Amino acid sequence: MSGSFDRKLSSILTDISSSLSCHAGSKDSPTLPESTVTDLGYYSAPQHDYYSGQPYGQTVNPYTYHHQFNLNGLAGTGAYSPKSEYTYGGSYRQYGAYREQPLPAQDPVSVKEEPEAEVRMVNGKPKKVRKPRTIYSSYQLAALQRRFQKAQYLALPERAELAAQLGLTQTQVKIWFQNRRSKFKKLYKNGEVPLEHSPNNSDSMACNSPPSPALWDTSSHSTPAPARNPLPPPLPYSASPNYLDDPTNSWYHTQNLSGPHLQQQPPQPATLHHASPGPPPNPGAVY
């Protein structure tokens, strides 16, 4: 054992001394030595003997080099580890499994947290929850009552205006009028309609109610038909027409005032004939 170690040590010392002598000779001459081939074989032989016991792969093995750095603490994080990709894949798979697990658990929870607010289960049957009733003030009730006496049916603009005046919604006004009409019809059938809501005082009910026969009878007797009026008595026959006897006749009055001009302004027989129902005028009666 010690003999082999001594031989290796002596060979190493011989190599060192020969290399020193070779470098000293090369410094003296500016050119390379002539025996280049022999020197190459001389250097290659001891190198082969020295590195024969150690394979080439062990000196350049990256894993061995990596573990040496791990011992010194320079690469403690393991960034250059060949198994880093597997650890990353495992962590990613764990993250994927973690993300997929709560998803099916959230679906039934979301369904349970959002039930319908207006439907309640009573004895296994769905029952709709009624909304709270609207409480009207005395001022609102008085205004609605006065408007109901005028008209039992409101148009859309009228309903919107009334709701804005009373501070109510249009739905509340519509529901109040519907309830009031149903109550009024029930009282009307039972004969308990108050005087203020009688058909004579309400325009809308007057149109819907049947006509009163007493009103039609009194109107027919009080206002007789014009066809039943007696004819006026016939006028007595006179020789002179009516327009001559009437002193207010403007044409006759002007003719009497201007006597000498009677022949210059003869009367129009067509208009005079239509004006009087009697016989045609006689021009000789004027004189």
Swiss-Prot record:
GO BP of this protein: blood vessel development; BMP signaling pathway; gene expression; hair cell differentiation; hair cycle; hair follicle cell proliferation; hair follicle development; hair follicle morphogenesis
Region (Disordered): 195-287
Pfam families: DLL_N, Homeodomain
Coiled coil location: none
Extent of Polar residues compositional bias: 198-209, 247-265
Disulfide bonds: none
SMART domains in the record: HOX
Compartments where located: Nucleus; Cytoplasm
Keyword Transcription: yes
Keywords: Activator, Cytoplasm, Developmental protein, DNA-binding, Homeobox, Nucleus, Transcription, Transcription regulation
Cross-referenced InterPro entries: Distal-less_Homeobox_TF, Distal-less_N, HD, HD_metazoa, Homeobox_CS, Homeodomain-like_sf, HTH_motif
Record text on subunit structure and interactions: Heterodimer with MEIS1. Interacts with IPO7; the interaction facilitates nuclear translocation of DLX3 in dental papilla cells.
Family: Belongs to the distal-less homeobox family.
Role noted for this protein: Transcriptional activator. Activates transcription of GNRHR, via binding to the downstream activin regulatory element (DARE) in the gene promoter.
Protein name stated in the entry: Homeobox protein DLX-3
